[in-house]
Swiss-Prot record:
Origin species: Petrotoga mobilis (strain DSM 10674 / SJ95)
Gene name, Swiss-Prot/TrEMBL: guaA
Subunit annotation: Homodimer.
Protein name: GMP synthase [glutamine-hydrolyzing]
Active site: C77 (nucleophile), H164, E166
Domain of life: Bacteria
Length: 507
């Protein structure tokens, strides 16, 4: 199968870049910069960005094998700086960093910029800059600060850009990638997610064989798709385990049990572990520690259930790639943002072998795979819900009282969005309980209650997100209902932070 090889230098956007390539119908493979490289069936190479400076002692390098492969190369951000230094150009720090939206001007013709306006906005994230291009290379664009934003040597098939075309904030970013992949590399695009499904089912069969597996089923999109995909591969050798850790939304246990038995016919066991999780989290306020504890307890519960199944050796998890990236597992040079319960919280002495069939996919791709597998819309288009659940939506220590309050608040918010037709318009919405009490008025008396924060974001893959512009009249209705129906809440606020710089979840 013809493919584009993406070499990862530690960018948070590396797998997003791979996804953009797949969106163009071309298979992409991501490898680390120091992995052994096979160029079989490779038709083009992309060097990702990364957090390093090319002048650091241990800075990731590029091999002569790649530069001499006579394949089209696209260097992005760090990849551009690396090529410049390697081929005799100059990279410097001049005290002018460029972060976020930046305007660039095309200064010379380039196949990379075919049918693209001469001036457009891009997404930058760099301190180092190329101040001199290698011999026989030409500058093709400059930023409004007169900084080199792209250069190339068409005869050598080497193209370099300082900005990130894979991020949606870059105008015409997909067109630039398309120009490279189709126009320069000559790939037409015939790979589909159907290919992924077929290959993954075969891979799961080959991995698990006639052994048994259990799945960490939550009722969310990711674990649901992982369950059906695995069930297609090994049939009744899959047992679904639904753990009620006490941090689920209102009525969620009953809804999940009903949905999976009605729609999917899975062999489903519900484990009530509420007291176990709460006791482990008593006195814990640090969000990283919460995630680690919850991740470990999940595994222990699954191990105990697996021991009841003779021959059970595998644990299926619905980890997707945004989870992996945020846990700093995507590249050796990636900076850690926060751990994910499916990734960063796994105990080292786990007795089960982990299988993560969706770990290469983003949320929208997971939904597309679910559609291919025939899952109902009400499962596929539920808003994302974190594995630790409401535990990371209560700031500070968790107890029964706070959980009850948050469940009521969240239920009001979500139901109001559904009633007003806004639930399907936003990517994710939820409530957060802030354990700070503020003054309010109840009747003729002063009162003190908690603050509830509402969070709603628009996104596609979860790597970047904008806060949702929910109409004020709907927010007004939600706020009024919460303060009237949940007596412990005296104040409601709406989170208008985008990702980046914020993350979607508060913890």
């Amino acid at each position: 199968m013809e493919k584009i090889l993406v070499i990862d230098y530690g960018s948070q956007y590396t797998q997003l870049l791979a996804k953009r390539i797949r969106d163009l119908g071309v298979f992409s493979e991501v490898i680390q910069y120091d992995d052994n490289i096979s160029l079989s069936n490779v038709k083009g190479i992309i060097l990702s960005g990364g957090p390093d400076s090319v002048y650091n002692i241990d800075a990731p390098d590029i091999s002569d094998e790649i530069l001499n492969a006579e394949l089209p190369i696209l260097g992005i951000c760090y990849g551009m700086q690396l090529i410049a230094k390697k081929l005799g150009g100059k990279v410097e720090q001049r005290g002018i960093a460029e972060y976020g939206k930046t305007k660039i001007n095309i200064t010379d013709q380039s196949l990379l910029f075919k049918k693209i306006p001469s001036t457009f906005n891009v997404w930058m994230s760099h301190k180092d800059m190329v101040t001199k291009v290698p011999e026989k290379f030409k500058i093709t664009s400059l930023t409004s600060n007169n900084i080199i934003s792209s250069f190339e040597n068409e005869s050598e098939n080497i193209y370099c850009i300082q900005f990130h075309p894979e991020v949606r904030h870059t105008e015409f970013g997909i067109d630039i990638l398309k120009n490279f992949i189709q126009g320069i590399c000559g790939l037409k695009g015939s790979w589909t997610l159907m290919d992924f499904v077929e290959n993954k089912i075969k891979e799961i069969k080959d991995t698990i064989g006639d052994k048994k597996a259990i799945i960490a089923l939550s009722g969310g999109v990711d674990s649901s798709v992982a369950a059906v995909l695995t069930h297609r591969a090994i049939g009744n050798n899959l047992k679904a385990i639904f753990v009620n850790h006490g941090f689920l939304r209102m009525n969620e246990v009953e809804e999940v049990e009903s949905t999976f038995r009605d729609y999917m016919g899975l062999n489903l066991t519900t484990v009530d572990a509420q007291e176990r999780f709460l006791s482990k989290l008593k006195g814990v306020t640090d969000p990283e520690q919460k995630r680690k504890i919850i991740g470990e307890e999940f595994i222990r519960v699954f191990e105990q259930e697996a021991k009841k199944e003779e021959g059970c050796e595998y644990l299926i998890q619905g980890t997707i790639y945004s989870d992996v990236i945020e846990s700093a597992k995507s590249g050796k040079k990636t900076f850690k943002i926060k751990s994910h319960h499916n990734v960063g919280g796994l105990p080292e002495d786990i007795d089960l072998k982990i299988v993560e069939p969706l770990k290469e996919l983003f949320k929208d791709e997971v939904r597309s795979v679910g559609e291919i597998l025939g899952l109902p819309r009400e499962i596929l288009y539920r808003h994302p819900f974190p594995g630790p659940g409401l535990a990371i939506r209560i700031m500070g220590e968790i107890n029964d009282e706070k959980l009850t309050i948050l469940k009521k608040v969240d239920n009001i918010f979500i139901n109001t969005l559904k009633e007003t037709g806004w639930y399907d318009k936003v990517w994710q919405a939820f409530a957060v309980l802030i354990p700070v009490k503020t003054v309010g008025i109840t009747g003729d008396k002063r009162s003190y209650g908690y603050v509830a924060a509402l969070r709603s974001v628009d996104s596609v893959e979860g790597m970047t997100a904008d806060w949702s512009k929910v109409p004020f009249e709907i927010l007004d209705l939600v706020s009024s209902r919460i303060t009237n129906e949940v007596e412990e809440i005296t104040r409601v606020v709406y989170d208008i932070s985008s990702k980046p710089p914020a993350t979607i979840e508060w913890e």
